Amino acid sequence: MKILFATSEAHPLIKTGGLADVSGSLPDAYHHLKQKVRMVMPAYGDIWEKVSGVKQLSELSIAACGRQLHVRIHVASAEGIDVPIWLVDIPELFHRPGNPYLALDGKDWWDNGERFAVFSKVVAEIAMNRAGLKWQPDLVQTNDWQTGLVSALLTLEAERPKTVFTIHNMAYAGLFPKSLFEGLGLPWSWWEPHDGIEFYDNMSMLKAGIQMADWVTTVSPTYAKEITFPEYAYGLEGVLIKRLDEGRLVGILNGIDHDVWNPKTDPFIRYHYSVDKGRVAAKKRNKKDMLDFWDLPKAVVDADDPVIGLVGRLVPQKGIDLVLEVLPELIEQTNVRFVIVGTGDSLFEYQLTELAHQYPERLMIYIGYSESLAHKVEAGADLFLMPSRFEPCGLNQLYSLAYGTPPIVHSTGGLSDTVVNATKENLATGQATGFVFYDPSRHALKSTILHALHLFSKKGTWQKLQKNGMRQDFSWTRSAKQYLALFKAMV
């Protein structure tokens, strides 16, 4: 099968969030399962130094907002990506400082709507074999609002490829004014709320993808159900319920890249291990190595006190406010230590910094992001904390399972689908892999942490829990096979 994978970001070329991790891994997984895959993405100014073998393949002209834009399409390769990358080069739209969506002042680029609408038009031309590439896919997979218009544009075509639109996060709707809709020359039949892409007198590119793709997928089975409820759908529950009723909305779990996240080979950790070899000793040594980052006294580093790690954005969605509420009393009442790595809301950063000064040997923080430290925490912590209020899929809990670091999670989205709670029954049957709380409250979080600390003291039970988690299969191959089963049924 020929698959065109359209995305606005891909690791290691450019990354602002989890979409980049998916885009950097899922097309490769298709390729390794013998599919013919091309990835297409904008040629941002920062990308050129990260690619090699660049060659111009074609050029074309795209009309938008009263002007003709000259487009060059290049093919390139990149370390860590095994499929050809088609770069859509439109300098006036994409050769800019800052990240793909934000200017240097942290605000959205004023013309984001035009930028990604034009990119979507180019993708549609490629899909229809009108871009001079002499290649037409059987199926186009698009991702989030930035490529939402592709599916809509292809509904205007005869003999078109099938389309799948994948939702990674409903929180970003791609809302733009009616003037852009007019400037793009889109059909007026689309300017209505029920079967079109109008959303409260704006155009929603996210809604375009949901409404007009042949199939809609999202990144976990539970999130696929959650987004049909108002608290998760941001006003789009009606169209999502319609797609669910049509049998055209499905959740497929993301995977993890075992070339990057693997305790047997991880270049960021000092002591390697596997589920059956060296795990207990290596995790103790990795804990000491992790704690050495903070120049702690030897007595602290050598202590066998439990350490709970957290790596993530310090924002309400991630439940950081709940963590801040329970930290002081857990530190006062138990022997647990916390390691927190992340950046986010300035208030949360300040509060964590103050608590770290108050408990210098019990709470270690790093405000910022460090890839090396993130790996060290996964390998060195005894437990990993992920109390997100919502989480479409989540990756850190998957890393934690792979590293034998049982996660503590709130029951939502992909966290519900990937962590089996350590109840008495699940422990007895060998199914438990972590700890789950069901109410996003300080009481539920604290009691679950206390339960985890109790089990940590029971070494035999704890080692079984670690092994259960490490034996789970959350590979991208597993995810890709599920997508391909869907694609083959469509095509």
From Swiss-Prot:
What GO cellular-component annotations does this UniProt entry give?
A: cytosol
Alphabetical keyword list? Glycogen biosynthesis, Glycosyltransferase, Transferase
- Which reaction equations make up its catalytic activity? [(1->4)-alpha-D-glucosyl](n) + ADP-alpha-D-glucose = [(1->4)-alpha-D-glucosyl](n+1) + ADP + H(+)
Q: Does the keyword RNA-binding apply?
A: no
The positions annotated for binding ADP-alpha-D-glucose are 15
Q: Which Pfam families match?
A: Glyco_transf_5, Glycos_transf_1
Q: What's one GO MF term for it?
A: alpha-1,4-glucan glucosyltransferase (UDP-glucose donor) activity
Pathway field: Glycan biosynthesis; glycogen biosynthesis
EC number(s) given by UniProt? 2.4.1.21
Q: What's one GO BP annotation on this UniProt entry?
A: glycogen biosynthetic process
Q: Which domain of life is it from?
A: Bacteria
Please give the function described in this protein's UniProt entry.
Synthesizes alpha-1,4-glucan chains using ADP-glucose.
Entries under HAMAP family matching the protein:
Glycogen_synth
Tell me which family the UniProt entry assigns to this protein. Belongs to the glycosyltransferase 1 family. Bacterial/plant glycogen synthase subfamily.
Q: What is this protein called?
A: Glycogen synthase
What organism, scientifically named, is this protein from?
Hydrogenovibrio crunogenus (strain DSM 25203 / XCL-2) (Thiomicrospira crunogena)
Gene giving rise to this polypeptide: glgA
